[in-house]
From Swiss-Prot:
Encoding gene, per UniProt annotation: drs1
Protein name, entry field: ATP-dependent RNA helicase drs1
Helicase ATP-binding domain ranges (all copies): 290-464
Gene3D superfamilies for this protein: P-loop containing nucleotide triphosphate hydrolases (3.40.50.300)
PANTHER family: ATP-DEPENDENT RNA HELICASE DBPA, ATP-DEPENDENT RNA HELICASE RHLE-RELATED
GO cellular component, one term: nucleus
C-alpha cells in the first residue's frame, strides 16, 4: 500500500521489510512543515532515527498530534501512484521561503579547509608557543618619549616637492654621490680635469635617458664571455627546432589574440571565479598559453615578473578538470613551487578561481601539520600544490596517496628550484609520475640550466616567450643611490632616511643576510618604524604572519631576503628598496618585480656600492634597450649623518634586545625538550611502534650530490678565471671604433714600410 506524501512524510530508517513492519511497528507521519526541525536535530545530535520492534510509539520533541489533525484535510484519499503530475495548489508553495547560501556555514566540512593560517596557527599552537615576542622586547627597551608609530603621513605631493628642491639645491652632495659619473671611474684619485667633467655629468636631477658615460668597452670586457657563450651554432639551433613543436597550428594559435576571457570559450564557473578576482582581459602570457594548454600541449613559458604566469596555468587546469570522471576521486594535477610562500599564493589563486566548482585543492608545504596534510591527501584532492621536498615525503610515507593518475604536472619557477638544489628531487618526482602526462614549465628567467630539465621531462613542448629574458615592467621607475667607500658605514642611516623621510607605506626592503635583516628589524622597532621580517630563519607560522600583517596594512615595511623575491604578489606595493645590489641581474629582476605588477606603476631604489658595478652595468644596458626610466637619486646627507649618530647610540640597546631574545628562545627550547622527554617516557612504546619515514636518498647520496654540485661550481669558476687570464681574441661584431682603429693601424704599418 502506498501513501500519498503530499502533506506528510514518513520519518525513520526501515530495516525490517514491509510485511513485518505493517504488523509489529507503528509509523508516525510528520507534516512537511516540521521536516526542518528533525533535519536540524539529526545534524546536531549526529545519530540516525530507527524503528524498533519493541517500541509501542515514537515520541518526537516539540510535536503536537492534535495540531497535525487540525492541519490535515478531511478529504485525503489514498490513490495509486501515477506518472501524471498532481496539480499544484496554493498551499503547496510557501511564498516566504528563501534560499540561503550560508545556511550551513557553522557546520565543519573538510572541503572548507582553506590554509589561511588562522587555522594553521591553531593547529600548530605548540610550535607557535616556542616563538619569541620580539615586539614586546623592543617596546620594553624603547625610549619612553618615543611615539609608537606615526598616525598620519604626508601626501605623495608633499613628499615630492621638497625632494625635488633638495636635489636642485645641494649641488655639492650631488657631485659627490651622483651615480652617473662613477660608473666609469676606476680610481678615486684622478686628475682635476676628469673631476670637473664628472661633476658636470653628475648634475642630473631628472630621469637619465641613457647612461652614455658607460663605455661600450666596459660592457664588452665583462660580457664578452656571456655573449660568446650565448651565440649558438647551427647544429644546436637545429636540435632545438627538432625538439620543440613549432608547427603551423601552434604558430597560428599564438598569433591569435583574445580581447577577454569570454572569447576563450571557458566554462561559466571559471569565468565567474575570474570576474570575482577582477580578471577581465588576459595578459600576453595568458593569451598565448591558455589555448595551447587546453589542447594538452607541453609548454615552456617565460615572461616578465608580474605578468600573470600563475593564472596562465591555473585556468586551463581548472577548465579541463570540470570534465573529469567524478565516480572515483583521484589526484590528477601536481603543481611544484620552489618556496612555501609561492606555493601558498598559488593555492590561494587556485581556490579563488575554483570557488564555484567542486574541484578540491590541497596544499603540501613544510612548516604545516604533517597529519593534517595526510588527512587531506587521503581524500584524493584533484590538485596538489607542493614544494618538492614535502611532496616526496608524502609520496613515500603517506598511506593511500599515489601519483599513478597524475595527468598534468606544472613546475613553476623551475630555474629557482634547480638553483636551490632541488635537481635530484625533481628527477625523482618526474620518474614517479606517468610519462603520458601533460607538463608545463614556467619561469620569469629561462636560463640554459633549465635545458636538461626540459629535455628530461617535456615531450615536444611549445615555447611561449612573451618578453625578452631580462626585462622589467614598463611602468617601473628604477632609482640608484651611489654609496662611496668612505660612506659605506652610513648605509643603515641612508635606509632609515629613505623610510623616515620619503617612503612611509607598502615598502619591501631586500637584504643579502638573514642576520642583518633581523638586526635592522630591531633598529626599525626602536626607531618607531612599523616593520616586520621574512627570511629562512623564521618558522612557517612567523613567515605567514609577517606576510599577512604586511598585506593587511598592519606593518608598513617588510624586511626580506630573497625568500620573498619570487612570485609573491601583494597588491599595492609602492616601493622596493635594495639595501645592497643583488649578486646577479636575474635576482635583481625578481626583486624589483614585486612592484609595478599587473599594469600598475612602481619604484625600485638600489643603494649601489663600488662592488656592484657588474650587476648595474647589466641593468643600464637592458634599460637603454627597453627605454625604461633610470633616475639618479640624491640624499640630504646632513639628515643621513644625524640618523647615523642615532643608530650608533642605539647599538648597545640593539645588542641588549638581541641577547634578551636569545635567552627567551633558549628557555622556550629547553621547555620544549623537557616536554618532549616526558612524552617519550609516557608513550615510548607507541612512538617506537610507528613506521619510520623514508627518503629516496641516503646520507651518503646526499653528501655525494652536494660534493658534485660544489665541484661543478669550482670548475666553472676556474674556467672563467682561465678565460680571463688568456688573451684570446673573442669573436664579436666589430663596432665603428674598432673599424677606425684597424684602419689607423694599417695606415701606420704601410707608412713605416715606405
Amino acid at each position: 500500500m502506498l501513501w500519498n506524501t503530499q502533506y506528510f512524510r514518513i520519518e525513520g530508517m526501515i530495516s525490517l521489510g514491509w510485511p513485518r513492519l505493517a504488523k509489529t511497528s507503528i509509523l508516525k507521519f510528520v507534516p512537511i512543515a516540521q521536516n526542518h526541525r528533525i533535519r536540524k536535530m539529526k545534524v546536531q545530535d549526529d545519530f540516525i532515527l530507527t524503528i524498533d520492534d519493541s517500541e509501542d510509539d515514537i515520541h518526537y520533541d516539540d510535536y503536537d498530534a492534535d495540531a497535525v489533525d487540525e492541519e490535515m484535510p478531511s478529504n485525503v484519499e489514498l490513490k495509486k501512484k501515477s506518472k501524471k503530475a498532481t496539480p499544484a495548489k496554493d498551499s503547496d508553495f510557501n511564498g516566504e521561503f528563501l534560499f540561503e547560501a550560508d545556511v550551513n556555514k557553522d557546520l565543519s566540512s573538510a572541503t572548507d579547509m582553506n590554509w589561511d593560517f588562522d587555522m594553521g596557527s591553531k593547529t600548530e599552537s605548540n610550535r607557535a608557543s616556542n616563538t619569541v615576542d620580539l615586539d614586546a622586547i623592543i617596546s620594553r627597551n624603547r625610549k619612553p618619549d618615543d611615539d609608537e608609530f606615526p598616525s598620519s603621513f604626508p601626501s605623495e605631493e608633499e613628499l615630492q616637492e621638497p625632494e625635488q628642491e633638495n636635489i636642485d639645491s645641494d649641488d655639492e652632495d650631488l657631485a659627490i654621490d651622483g651615480f652617473g659619473a662613477g660608473a666609469i671611474a676606476e680610481n678615486e684619485d684622478e686628475s682635476s680635469q676628469d673631476e670637473s667633467e664628472s661633476e658636470e655629468e653628475d648634475d642630473i636631477t631628472e630621469p637619465v635617458p641613457s647612461f652614455a658615460n658607460i663605455s661600450t668597452q666596459d660592457f664588452n670586457s665583462d660580457s664578452a664571455a656571456g655573449s660568446s657563450d650565448s651565440e649558438e651554432d647551427e647544429e644546436e639551433i637545429a636540435k632545438k627546432n627538432a625538439f620543440f613543436a613549432e608547427g603551423d597550428k601552434e604558430k597560428s594559435m599564438m598569433t591569435t589574440t583574445h580581447s577577454s576571457f569570454q572569447s576563450m570559450n571557458l566554462s561559466r564557473p571559471i569565468l565567474k571565479g575570474l570576474s570575482n578576482l577582477g580578471f577581465e582581459v588576459p595578459t600576453q602570457i595568458q593569451d598565448k598559453t591558455i589555448p595551447l594548454a587546453l589542447l594538452g600541449k607541453d609548454i615552456v613559458g617565460a615572461a616578465v615578473t608580474g605578468s600573470g604566469k600563475t593564472a596562465a596555468f591555473i585556468v586551463p587546469i581548472l577548465e579541463r578538470l570540470l570534465y573529469r570522471p567524478k565516480k572515483v576521486p583521484t589526484t590528477r594535477v601536481l603543481i611544484l613551487c620552489p618556496t612555501r610562500e609561492l606555493a601558498m599564493q598559488c593555492h590561494s589563486v587556485a581556490t579563488k578561481i575554483a570557488s564555484f566548482t567542486d574541484i578540491m585543492v590541497c596544499l603540501c608545504i613544510g612548516g604545516l601539520s604533517l597529519k593534517l596534510q595526510e588527512q587531506e591527501l587521503r581524500k584524493r584532492p584533484d590538485i596538489v600544490i607542493a614544494t618538492p621536498g614535502r611532496f616526496i615525503d608524502h609520496m613515500r610515507n603517506s598511506q593511500g596517496f599515489t601519483v599513478e593518475n597524475i595527468e598534468i604536472m606544472v613546475m613553476d619557477e623551475a630555474d629557482r628550484m634547480l638553483e636551490d638544489g632541488f635537481a635530484d628531487e625533481l628527477n625523482e618526482i618526474i620518474q614517479a609520475c606517468p610519462k603520458s602526462r601533460q607538463t608545463m614549465l614556467f619561469s620569469a628567467t629561462m636560463t640554459d640550466k633549465v635545458d636538461d630539465l626540459i629535455r628530461l621531462s617535456l615531450n615536444r613542448p611549445v615555447r611561449v616567450f612573451v618578453d625578452n629574458k631580462k626585462t622589467t615592467a614598463k611602468l617601473l621607475t628604477q632609482e640608484f643611490v651611489r654609496v662611496r667607500p668612505q660612506r659605506e658605514l652610513l648605509r643603515p642611516a641612508m635606509l632609515i632616511y629613505l623610510c623616515k623621510e620619503l617612503f612611509h607605506r607598502r615598502t619591501i626592503i631586500f637584504f643579502r643576510s638573514k642576520a642583518f635583516a633581523h638586526k635592522m628589524r630591531v633598529i626599525f622597532g626602536l626607531l618607531s618604524l612599523n616593520a616586520t621580517e621574512i627570511h629562512g630563519s623564521l618558522s612557517q607560522e612567523q613567515r605567514v604572519r609577517a606576510l599577512e600583517d604586511f598585506r593587511d596594512g598592519k606593518c608598513n615595511y617588510l624586511l626580506a631576503t630573497d625568500v620573498a623575491s619570487r612570485g609573491i604578489d601583494i597588491k599595492g606595493i609602492e616601493v622596493v628598496i635594495n639595501y645592497e645590489a643583488p649578486a646577479t641581474h636575474e635576482v635583481y629582476l625578481h626583486r624589483v618585480g614585486r612592484t609595478a605588477r599587473a599594469g600598475r606603476s612602481g619604484r625600485a631604489i638600489t643603494l649601489a656600492g663600488e662592488g656592484d658595478r657588474k650587476v648595474l652595468k647589466g641593468v643600464f644596458k637592458n634599460s637603454s634597450a627597453q627605454n625604461t626610466k633610470l633616475v639618479n637619486r640624491n640624499l640630504d646627507f646632513n639628515k643621513v649623518e644625524k640618523f647615523g649618530k642615532e643608530i650608533e647610540e642605539l647599538e648597545p640597546v640593539v645588542q641588549k634586545v638581541l641577547d634578551e631574545e636569545k635567552q627567551e628562545r633558549e628557555l622556550k627550547i629547553a621547555e620544549r625538550d623537557l616536554k618532549k622527554g616526558e612524552n617519550i617516557m609516557k608513550y615510548g612504546d607507541e612512538i617506537r611502534s610507528r613506521p619510520a619515514r623514508t627518503w629516496f636518498q641516503s646520507e651518503k647520496d646526499k653528501q655525494a650530490s652536494k660534493a658534485s654540485e660544489a665541484k661543478d661550481k669550482k670548475s666553472l669558476a676556474k674556467r672563467k678565471k682561465q678565460m680571463e687570464k688568456e688573451e684570446v681574441p673573442r669573436a664579436y661584431k666589430k663596432t665603428k671604433n674598432d673599424r677606425l682603429s684597424n684602419k689607423k693601424s694599417t695606415k701606420k704599418s704601410k707608412s713605416k714600410r715606405k
